[in-house]
């Protein structure tokens, strides 16, 4: 298939592109910079959607970038980097004479309200209680297409675990030094997915015509607490992981974003499993062993 990927040059996009090309799909990227096998967002806006069978959007500024202060300017970048690119792709799909077979968007489990007791599947309510849940609601609304000529899929991703990027890249040094541990109380849930499975779900969604609607992009064993995750990462590295990161430190560094680390959701991939997708890394121990190998 001919696949157009928005934001395909980052940590997740690189893994997705590599898998798709390995499966024999022809991939073209939409990015800010021109280059071979790419079009720019401005070219997409001016010329419309190139001929393709599937469109995937992964674009979005990294919310947890520790080098950026959580101020009004950065909040606007977080919003516009997601909403504008999604609006643009959805508009291009709507206006083209040859619409793609599928349109796939990756959002986040921040849609669901943090809780120490509730369990969320794809039909659970959410999306209207803080900046991040409202962001996901607006993001998914921006992607909706009129009619049914194009199959629409939304993957709400958990924390993505993989080599060379993502959340775990910031954790490895202190954990390797034996200075790692739970964040805050450690009781909060930590919904996770191996990057190979997130890419795998996207590939499965574009190849399997019966897949549509919302899928939770988390591992079956992602009902893990932050403390359990810290212990598992320490074990994978052969290091102790008992030194907690105080919530005051997390709030000082991340501001309002700290809620994403200090609170969590128990999310299950009920509909994802029902589609028939087979996880490569359903369990945390094997996922971390692969990541730190």
Curated annotation (Swiss-Prot):
EC number(s) stated in the UniProt entry for this protein: 1.1.1.-
Root EC class: oxidoreductase
List of residues binding NADP(+): 31-32, 58-59, 77, 82, 160
Pfam (any one): Epimerase
Lineage top rank: taxon: Eukaryota
Sorted UniProt keywords: NADP, Oxidoreductase
Record keyword Repeat present: no
Molecular function GO terms recorded: oxidoreductase activity
NCBIfam families: yfcH (TIGR01777)
Family from the record: Belongs to the NAD(P)-dependent epimerase/dehydratase family. SDR39U1 subfamily.
Protein function: Putative NADP-dependent oxidoreductase.
Record-given protein name: Epimerase family protein SDR39U1
């Amino acid at each position: 298939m001919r696949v157009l990927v928005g934001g395909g040059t980052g940590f997740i996009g690189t893994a997705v592109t590599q898998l798709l090309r390995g499966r024999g799909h022809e991939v073209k990227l939409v990015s800010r910079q021109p280059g071979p096998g790419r079009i720019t967002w401005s070219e997409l806006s001016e010329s419309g959607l190139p001929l393709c069978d599937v469109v995937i959007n992964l674009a979005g500024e990294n919310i947890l970038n520790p080098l950026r202060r959580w101020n009004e300017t950065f909040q606007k970048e977080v919003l516009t980097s997601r909403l504008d690119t999604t609006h643009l792709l959805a508009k291009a799909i709507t206006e083209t004479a040859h619409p793609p077979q599928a349109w796939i968007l990756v959002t986040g489990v921040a849609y669901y309200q943090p809780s120490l007791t509730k369990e969320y599947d794809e039909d659970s309510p959410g999306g209207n209680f803080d900046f991040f849940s409202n962001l996901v609601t607006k993001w998914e609304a921006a992607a909706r297409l009129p009619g049914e000529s194009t199959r629409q899929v939304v993957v709400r991703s958990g924390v993505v675990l993989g080599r060379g990027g993502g959340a775990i890249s910031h954790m490895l040094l202190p954990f390797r030094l034996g200075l790692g541990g739970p964040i805050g109380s450690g009781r909060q849930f930590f919904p996770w997915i191996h990057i190979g499975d997130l890419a795998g779900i996207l590939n499965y969604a574009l190849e399997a015509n019966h897949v549509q609607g919302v899928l939770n992009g988390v591992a079956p064993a992602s009902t893990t607490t932050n403390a359990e995750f810290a212990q598992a990462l320490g074990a994978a590295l052969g290091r102790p992981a008992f030194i907690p990161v105080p919530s005051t430190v997390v709030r000082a560094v991340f501001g309002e974003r700290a809620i994403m680390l200090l609170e969590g959701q128990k999310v299950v991939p009920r509909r994802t499993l029902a589609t028939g997708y087979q996880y490569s890394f359903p369990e945390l121990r094997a996922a971390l062993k692969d990541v730190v190998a």
